[in-house]
Every structure is written in C-alpha cells, then in structure tokens.
Curated annotation (Swiss-Prot):
One of the primary rRNA binding proteins, it binds directly to 16S rRNA central domain where it helps coordinate assembly of the platform of the 30S subunit. This is Small ribosomal subunit protein uS8. PROSITE patterns: RIBOSOMAL_S8 (PS00053). GO terms for cellular component: ribonucleoprotein complex; ribosome. GO terms for molecular function: rRNA binding; structural constituent of ribosome. Belongs to the universal ribosomal protein uS8 family.
Length: 133
C-alpha cells in the first residue's frame, strides 16, 4: 500500500507506541524522517535513534522516553500542521510558539529541519511540519 504522507505516518507510529508505553518503534527511514527524529531527540522527546536493515528496507528505530515511576510519555501530543493538500508556511515573525514555548514546532527551512526556537535564532521561516508537546 502506498503511503502518501510519510510524515503523518511517522508521527502516528510514534504517538501510538507512546500511548501503549512501548520501549521503541520502527519508522521507514528517509532524509526527512531522520531530520525530524534528530530534532525530537535534541528537544528531549526521544532517547535514542538507530537504524536497522539496508537499502530500501532501512528503518529508524526510535527509543521513546518516559518520565516518573508511572512511565508517563514525554510526548503528550503530536499534531501534523502542513499537509500535502494544504501547505502552511510562516516567516520568522509568524513562527508559532507551542503552548507558550513549552512545546516545539518542527519547521522545514532552507537551512534544514529544525525547531521553532532554532529557526527564530537563525532568522529563517519555512514550512511548519508539526507541533509536539
């Protein structure tokens, strides 16, 4: 079955694994999924990124993070913003602050995929891929 929106698929896999308290989840590897996973790791939402398989069948294995003795997921919500049918672009001043700065907006810019904070520091705008908090 063809996957028409790999970013939504990645976010859904992470969200479902997190809600079910799985240790890790597998996501089909691509440059975009690697970039998004790196931003999630830098922002403290996932613990570890590794790859398995080779060639076309390479998967990213994302080790999820939990907090406290009840293992509450660090990812409370993930929302896709810009979709294939409706792309959302923002300039530097228009970049959203998720939950007043507690969450992260992941932005695809001309300088690569980065968090909203990094995009503001570098003075670039771009496509708002998703919100994570």
């Amino acid at each position: 079955m063809a996957n028409h929106d790999p970013i939504s698929d990645m976010l859904t896999r992470i969200r479902n694994a997190s809600e079910k308290r799985h240790q890790n989840t597998k996501v089909p590897a691509s440059r975009m999924s690697r970039s998004i996973a790196k931003v999630l790791q830098q922002e403290g939402f996932i613990a570890e990124i590794s790859e398995e398989g080779e060639g076309v069948h390479t998967n990213l294995v994302l080790e999820l993070k939990y907090s406290g003795k009840h293992r509450l997921p660090t990812i409370r919500s993930m929302q896709r913003v810009s979709k294939p049918g409706l792309r959302i672009y923002k300039n530097t001043r228009g970049l959203p602050k998720v939950l007043g700065g507690l969450g992260v907006a992941i932005i695809s810019t001309s300088k690569g995929v980065m968090s909203d904070r990094d995009a503001r520091k570098q003075g670039v705008g771009g496509e708002v891929l998703c919100y994570v908090y």
